[in-house]
Amino acid sequence: MQNFKELGISDKMAETLQSMGFNEATPIQKESIPLALEGKDVLGQAQTGTGKTGAFGIPLIEKVADQEGVQSLILAPTRELAMQVAESLKAFAKGQNIQVVTVFGGMPIDRQIKALKKGPQIVVGTPGRVIDHLNRRTLKTNDIHTLILDEADEMMNMGFIDDMKFIMDKIPAEQRQTMLFSATMPKAIQTLVQQFMKSPVIVKTMNNEMSDPQIEEYYTIVKELEKFDTFTSFLDVHQPELAIVFGRTKRRVDELTSALISKGYKAEGLHGDITQAKRLEVLKKFKNDQLDILVATDVAARGLDISGVSHVYNFDIPQDTESYTHRIGRTGRAGKKGVAITFVNPIEMDYIRQIEQANKRQMTALRPPHRKEVLKARENDIKGKVQNWMSRDNEPRLQRIATELLGEYNDVDLIASLLQELVESNDEVDVQLTFEKPLSRGKGRQGKGGPKRGGNHKRGGGKFDNKNRRSGKGGFNNKKKNDRPSSDRNNNKKSMKGRTFADHKK
């Protein structure tokens, strides 16, 4: 890696970065920063977690003048990403008279108008709210010299392509430098680049990253009715530090979250119907290690930048390769290894093949853990918990009960009975998940294949409710508006010999 000072930044910025613990530039920063400082348009293709914010944020702060008026506009797909970008920019601008304001939906617009009237140099926002301010003329483009689009493909996926064009058209090309970053380059983004950017220099770090992947990718073949039990078995054996679980629909996310909580896991869910206040609360808990598992739809997870995610579980297989790339990109960051496991119905294997072909690498087949492996993992977990409990002060009344029990029973038998109850307690909890049809062999459509009847899990796990099909109480014919594959808006069998579960290490 290259030292930041060699990239042409000022001594002040170099000192700021050093105080933040940034000593060497990432590949995307190494390539982008000199180009941005020269004023060239930059087209960067890199995944989230590769240092993109620094790639455009560091040169941006260097170019912003110490005078009132918006000089730079940054577009981001979600509120969370907008806030994260703004916080990074404020850190880069430490000690300088540079103000950064965020504008996004779900928050009172009056406060944002008041903040904009104070003359910030940088505005970070989501496309919809930025357009609101442009139409109200509370955001003026006269002095904007730098326009940045972060995660442009995500904004496209969320239906913002026309909004991006509208905003770019409001800032004449001869007036602005444009920097666009995207993990993928679909045709719509390529068209946007051709129409609105001036001879952009392409910076692409994806190939290098993919040749040395930090993410171990697996798939496990499992029928819908066995999926929840298999999933919790993996959780028990993996003991993930932080995990993100992806479900296809809002209903799936809600039911999975409730089921996990009932089993004793610390989980919360995110989807498009969650309020902004609740969303921020959930993300704060997740970042502060108050949660182990975040369950989310694709759209709800877009723009999230959470460090320390050790595992990604695709409870429902994504419908396209781009969604798969974005999902698993939540782990394996900052040089750390990550694990991604996709649960696939036998009739959905064509989707695995499509993902492998698009990414030019194979996923490894992984069998579900055996019951003995699960129990052994639970025993080790309980042993660790007991050791922690022993360091706490016990209530006198509990000590009295313990003394009485030890007088009546053999101490080893007594402890063994209590441990058995702890180890097997999860098996007694019965949960319900609505049956979801597997995807068809067609591209991007929900299929008609798969099992035709629901049933009960017998291994102590979930039950798929297939009763009262016409009454709206579950069943796979119960289609609701928020049950469509989550935009939140608008069979080949492969041998399972490849990798045994015992081969997988945390």
UniProtKB/Swiss-Prot annotation:
A motif (Q motif) lies at residues 2-30. Keywords: ATP-binding, Cytoplasm, Helicase, Hydrolase, Nucleotide-binding, RNA-binding, Stress response. Residues 434-506 are annotated as: Disordered. This is DEAD-box ATP-dependent RNA helicase CshA. DEAD-box RNA helicase possibly involved in RNA degradation. Unwinds dsRNA in both 5'- and 3'-directions, has RNA-dependent ATPase activity. ATP binds at A46, Q47, T48, G49, T50, G51, K52, T53. It catalyses: ATP + H2O = ADP + phosphate + H(+). The keyword ATP-binding applies. Belongs to the DEAD box helicase family. CshA subfamily. It comes from Staphylococcus saprophyticus subsp. saprophyticus (strain ATCC 15305 / DSM 20229 / NCIMB 8711 / NCTC 7292 / S-41). The gene is cshA. It is an enzyme of class 3 (hydrolase). HAMAP family: DEAD_helicase_CshA. Residues 440-461 have a biased composition (Basic residues). Its main location: cytoplasm. Oligomerizes, may be a member of the RNA degradosome. One of its GO terms (cellular component) is cytosol. GO terms for biological process: response to cold; RNA catabolic process. InterPro entries: DEAD/DEAH_box_helicase_dom, DEAD_box_RNA_helicases, DEAD_helicase_CshA, Helicase_ATP-bd, Helicase_C-like, P-loop_NTPase, RNA-helicase_DEAD-box_CS, RNA_helicase_DEAD_Q_motif. GO terms for molecular function: ATP binding; ATP hydrolysis activity; RNA helicase activity; RNA strand annealing activity.
